[in-house]
Structures are given as structure tokens and as C-alpha cells.
Amino acid sequence: SEEAPATVFSQKHDLSSGGRAVEFVSLDKPGEVPVRQSTGLAEFDRALGGGLVPGSAILMGGDPGIGKSTLLLQAAAAIARAGRRCVYVSGEEATAQVRMRAARLGLADAPVSLASTTSVRDILTTLGTMEPPGLLVIDSIQTMHSDTIEGAPGTVSQVRGCAFELIRYAKENGVALVLVGHVTKDG
């Protein structure tokens, strides 16, 4: 029994336990194609390749103030009005501010669930108590934090860790996830 050569990865990680088998599917075999979910905004759907895919994660980046939050609130309202549950979490604005924007856009009657928090643990704990939504918007990923990760909100480790936890939830539960990211001079 010949031992596999040690690699940088295997030297850093104990590969002898804790993993689980991953199911591979063949690219050339027909499979179930997920149904894309329209955002109700034709150009946004076109940019997404036809709409949102359940279990996918989208990073919407751009300069502050260009309309990312407004666009996503409009998409969430359209999806919610079509009968899919939508959750919009703002780490930057109070729910009252989001409601005021919705009223200005004529979306005040849309059944979108709003929350104003920055704790990924609290978000995931709450989502774990209910049926997964069709759409989860996190506005913005730079404001989120996880108490299991070192560093302040907005640091590379926090952004990566929080995004990882949210993406894992989305994939495991078939939730379309949109993370808002603000582009800054620092990148």
C-alpha cells in the first residue's frame, strides 16, 4: 500500500476524517434543469441569463449610490407579488428607510420580508425556523459580520466568511441569493 505524496493542501488539512462523499454528475447526461425565476425586470433578467437560478449566488457590485438597492427592492417586490417569498436584509439602512424607498417606488404593498441587521448568525438562525425564501437579498455584504470569524465587518476575512456561510445556506436550500457589494477606491 503506497502512500500518496504529501501536498501543500494535505499538509495543512487532515484529510483522514471529517469529509463526506461528493456526488458527481456527468456533464453529457441529461439532468434536471432548474427553472429560472424572473425578476420582473427584463434587462436584469437578460443580464442574469434569463432570471435567477435557485441555489445560485449573485454578487451585484458597483459604486455607492448607483441604484443597486433600488433595483433589488424592485426585483424582490416583483418576485414576491408573483407568489415567491422574498427576504431583504439591509445592514446599511433601517427598515423604515427601506419602506420609504418602497413607497416612493410604488412597492409599499409588496409582501417582502424586511430586516435590518448585520449578524449572519442571526439571519441564518431566523431563516432556519421558516420555509426557505425564493430570494434572499443581503445589502451589503461589507456590513455583515460573523462572531465566529476574526476581524471587523468589511475586512477581507469577514466578507469572505460571511459570503461563504450565506452561499452555503443558499445552495443547501435552493435559495437564489444576491449579495450587494460596494466598489470602493480600495477595491
Question: What feature does the model see in each segment?
Answer:
Residues 21-25, 29, 35-37, 143, ...:
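Residue-level signal for well-ordered alpha-helical segments
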Residues 42, 53-55, 62-66, 70-75, ...:
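Conserved inter-motif catalytic segment of the P-loop NTP-binding fold
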Residues 1-58, 80-85:
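Detector for small/aliphatic-rich hydrophobic stretches
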Residues 159, 167, 173-187:
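P-loop/Walker A NTP-binding module and the surrounding RecA-like catalytic core of P-loop NTPases
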Residues 1-7, 141, 180-187:
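Cys/His-rich Zn2+-binding cysteine-cluster or related metal-binding knuckle/ribbon modules and their
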